[in-house]
């Protein structure tokens, strides 16, 4: 995060200086740090250190993505739309005021083709062979009041692509087949009614063959004018008058029959005189409407010198200001570039989509004014609080809290059947024994109470303590048998086994919720593998052996796979060697693990050596 210090700390909140409408949800991001207590308010240096923690993670992910990208950046929808909006829309029309001499002549219909030369080898008396991809038809002047077919519109690549590739000879070709027979013809395309503007039927192309007048507008001529024009970048329409020499020629019919190609021959043309045709070419970006809607593009360049206007406009278009809250730091990126991973996002909306989805450890406030495209970046409160606690408290001195499950006390209580009332006869030995036991118990209780009274200086009477003790004892003895009786009446089953539980298992402290029954798990695994149709019996068997092994050995992480393969080879080595198909299935499975980077070649070699050792031990009679 190469930050630039601001001259004023209030400049971090630059969004408040402009008349930019922002909702209350956006404004609350500016005061997110205010939710911390006074002892948690950090100085700018400490805040900057907290910002660097997530950035280290993002830098690590970015370096990993260089060699193994998670996805193609150019396939993102917002980048595709941004690229489409940067394409140039070219409109070609014929102004009647500049072609007064031609209005009396019949130059219509006039075909406009967007073509590219297929070969640069010149042939005497012939033009290069062109292959056209787009075709339009003009039937009138644009100021004649007849708007039907008065303009020909094309969409070409963006200006940067045209300049970088030098357009490879892209050309607009104008072909006039005007005759008295075709005078007044309107509403017809190049292919007439048989085909659309984008699709050309080969049979209809043959109608173009014959004598004609043709001229061309090289795309390089437009590049030279558009490259030095700042209005195109600002979303305005750029108009350029161009004079074209319409030369007589003969359109070869043989080329029209091969993949939308055409060539002109000057030898077969009659002694016709060429003429000059005045054409108006208008250029604008395809997304010009969206550009003009943005308040950032309504900035006035009246104070900028004309010599520096184009340079300043280009530098300003994709600049985004990032304000890092409470750090007194900010930075500016070009071409709508993310400051964390340096990904070009195409436009401001694409930058918003990228940062909110790829860098969610921060809060963002996106806003646009006449002077700035800005993003206020704030560290999330939860992350900041975690880092604050981790910085202040040493892990070795932190108190570790552990709360165990409530453990039932084991009390030896007579069964419910013995707790029933028992009637004794008066004067019987049983009654005498019971009375003597009660007297001994009462004497012990009185002795305990007297001792406690002496120790604590209590003045409470013995009857109060006796009443309290007897009430607790009676309630405990009365409640527990009832609970046991209720537990005995109901039938409980294991959650996984679906088997009935014994009464001792119900009263025990062991929880059967997380237990896994191996027999049931093996049965379910076999049922799942039986549903596979394109798998052999031995492959199903090796899959079942592996699934059962990793379940019993608790193989949970990818790092466990190497030693699990070695242990599997030792455990099932005898069984694998007895069945060659099973052995090859195990080796193919290890190759699949190697393809997924879960197993190294060294571990595969170790597993094969383990199997070889087991095989040698079986074949060696001395070791047996």
From Swiss-Prot:
GO biological process per UniProt: cell differentiation; chromatin organization
CDD domains for this protein: VEFS-box_EMF2-like (cd21553), ZnB-Zn_EMF2-like (cd21749)
For this protein, the record's InterPro entries field holds: EMF2-like_DUF7651, Polycomb_protein_VEFS-Box
For this UniProt record, give its keywords in alphabetical order, as a comma-separated list. Answer: Chromatin regulator, Developmental protein, Differentiation, Metal-binding, Transcription, Transcription regulation, Zinc, Zinc-finger
The segment annotated Disordered runs over 420-445
Q: Where are the zinc fingers (C2H2-type)?
A: 338-359
Task: Look up keyword Transcription and say if it applies.
Answer: yes
Which GO-annotated molecular functions does the record name? Answer: chromatin DNA binding; zinc ion binding
Q: Where is the composition biased (Acidic residues)?
A: 432-445
Family assignment from sequence similarity: Belongs to the VEFS (VRN2-EMF2-FIS2-SU(Z)12) family.
- Give the function comment from the record: Polycomb group (PcG) protein. PcG proteins act by forming multiprotein complexes, which are required to maintain the transcriptionally repressive state of homeotic genes throughout development. PcG proteins are not required to initiate repression, but to maintain it during later stages of development. They act via the methylation of histones, rendering chromatin heritably changed in its expressibility.
- This protein is called Polycomb group protein EMF2A
Q: Which organism is it from?
A: Oryza sativa subsp. japonica
């Amino acid at each position: 995060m190469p930050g630039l210090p601001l001259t004023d700390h209030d400049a971090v909140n630059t969004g408040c200086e402009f008349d930019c409408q922002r909702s209350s949800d956006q404004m609350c991001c500016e005061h997110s740090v205010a939710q911390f207590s006074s002892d948690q308010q950090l100085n700018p240096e400490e805040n900057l250190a907290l910002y660097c923690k997530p950035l280290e993670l993002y830098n690590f992910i970015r370096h990993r993505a260089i060699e193994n990208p998670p996805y193609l950046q150019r396939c993102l929808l917002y980048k595709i739309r941004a690229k489409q909006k940067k394409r140039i829309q070219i409109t070609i029309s014929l102004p009647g005021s500049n072609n007064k001499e031609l209005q009396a002549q019949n130059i219509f219909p006039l075909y406009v083709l967007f073509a590219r030369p297929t070969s640069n080898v010149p042939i005497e008396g012939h033009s290069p062979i062109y292959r056209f991809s787009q075709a339009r038809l003009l039937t009138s002047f644009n100021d004649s009041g007849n708007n039907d077919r008065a303009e020909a519109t094309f969409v070409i690549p963006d200006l940067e692509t045209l300049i970088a590739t030098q357009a490879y000879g892209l050309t607009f070709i104008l072909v006039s087949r005007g005759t008295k027979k075709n005078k007044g013809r309107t509403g017809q395309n190049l292919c007439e009614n048989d085909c659309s503007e984008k699709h050309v039927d080969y049979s209809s192309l043959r109608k173009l063959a014959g004598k004609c007048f043709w001229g061309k507008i090289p795309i390089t001529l437009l590049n030279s004018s558009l490259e030095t024009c700042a209005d195109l970048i600002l979303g305005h329409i750029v108009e350029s008058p161009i004079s074209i020499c319409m030369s007589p020629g003969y359109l070869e019919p043989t080329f029209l029959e091969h993949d939308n190609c055409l060539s002109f021959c000057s030898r077969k043309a009659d002694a016709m005189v060429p003429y000059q045709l005045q054409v108006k070419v208008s250029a604008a970006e395809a997304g010009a409407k969206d550009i003009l809607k943005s308040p950032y593009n309504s900035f006035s360049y009246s104070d900028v010198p004309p010599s520096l206007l184009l340079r300043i406009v280009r530098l300003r278009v994709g600049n985004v200001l990032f304000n890092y809250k409470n750090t007194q730091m900010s930075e500016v990126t070009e071409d709508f570039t993310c400051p964390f991973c340096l990904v070009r996002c195409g436009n401001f909306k694409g930058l918003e989509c990228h940062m909110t989805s790829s860098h969610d450890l921060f809060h963002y406030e996106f806003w646009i004014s006449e002077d700035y495209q800005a993003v206020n970046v704030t560290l999330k409160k939860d992350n900041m609080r975690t880092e604050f606690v981790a910085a202040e408290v040493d892990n070795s001195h932190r108190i570790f809290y552990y709360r165990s499950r409530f453990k039932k006390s084991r009390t030896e209580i007579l069964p419910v059947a013995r707790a029933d009332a028992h009637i004794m006869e008066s004067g019987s030995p049983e009654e005498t024994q019971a009375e003597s036991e009660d007297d001994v118990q009462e004497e012990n209780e009185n002795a305990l109470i007297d001792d406690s009274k002496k120790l604590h200086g209590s003045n409470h009477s013995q009857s109060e303590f006796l009443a309290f003790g007897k009430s607790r004892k009676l309630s405990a003895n009365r409640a527990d048998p009832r609970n046991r009786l209720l537990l005995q009446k109901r039938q409980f089953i294991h959650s996984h086994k679906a088997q009935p539980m014994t009464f001792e298992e119900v009263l025990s402290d062991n929880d059967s919720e997380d237990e896994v029954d191996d027999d049931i798990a093996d049965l379910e695994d076999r049922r799942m593998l039986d549903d596979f149709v394109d798998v052999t019996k031995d492959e199903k068997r090796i899959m079942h052996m592996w699934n059962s092994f990793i379940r019993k050995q608790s193989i949970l992480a990818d790092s466990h796979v190497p030693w699990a393969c070695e242990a599997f080879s030792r455990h099932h080595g005898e069984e694998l060697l007895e069945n060659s198909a099973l052995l090859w299935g195990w080796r193919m499975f290890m190759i699949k693990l190697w393809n997924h980077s879960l197993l190294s070649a060294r571990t595969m070699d170790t597993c094969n050596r383990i199997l070889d050792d087991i095989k040698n031990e079986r074949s060696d009679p001395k070791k047996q």
